[in-house]
């Protein structure tokens, strides 16, 4: 059996073909076996309909071999294969993308068998299968600053993201023209005075969001702190853009904090939302140089560019099932 390196490896086409030839050729669909023995590849455009299979579990010898055998048995033509084994936690991660037309069964059956295989690997294994033909459903929360919202909506409008925006929710009316331009429902939920007013507003927001059954909730500069119960309810599918290079300058006015400290870099962080403010697992970060001559306003202006880019990357990786979390750390399989 051919086994690629476990740490951060990607299986090349030659290795993939070798693995498939070693594994139960009689079970492969005739069209795929014909291409393999004749050294042919399917015609591809780069936007193929794919099934994405992910798995994370305690590491042990033989997992990659079991995955290879499984994919060969179902006729899966591998388009991407990535692995990571964390030597500290002893945890294994993988993401496999296969050509949907090569699989000799329905999507539901493939999903059932993949989960069954994961359960055989161990009771602590987490597995899922997604179909790239099915757009993920998202809800965007925003306040008065619209630069991240404008950027995301432009990318989605041009078909760059596998995401359908169900609605936009805000505690201000300012971004409604953006929603109207793209034909997206806009829910303005004003926050009343005091903690009771805030709690009532969040209850309304929660009802709106949950009614849409979103795969992802994006806080695109939503300048309100989610209550702990919503953080727990939306755990693992709510992502935020914070305007600093975390863990530096958590909380409010990070650019003001950065200016007072005389930093030479400002940054942004895309992370999962948890009840621990600005301390969720980090998905993506980037920085921009600043100098002693930059004012706080200059830092804010430069930071906006980084915020847009970092959120765009982090959201894309989430939508493409490239993000896995274990022990507060993320594994990001490259695009």
Residue ranges and their predicted role:
Residues 17-18, 23:
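Cysteine-centered motifs
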Residues 171-172, 182, 196-200, 215-334:
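Donor/substrate-binding cores of folate-linked one-carbon enzymes
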Residues 180, 184-212:
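Adenosine-nucleotide cofactor-binding segment
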Residues 36-136:
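A conserved regulatory-domain signal marking ACT and ACT-like small-molecule sensing domains
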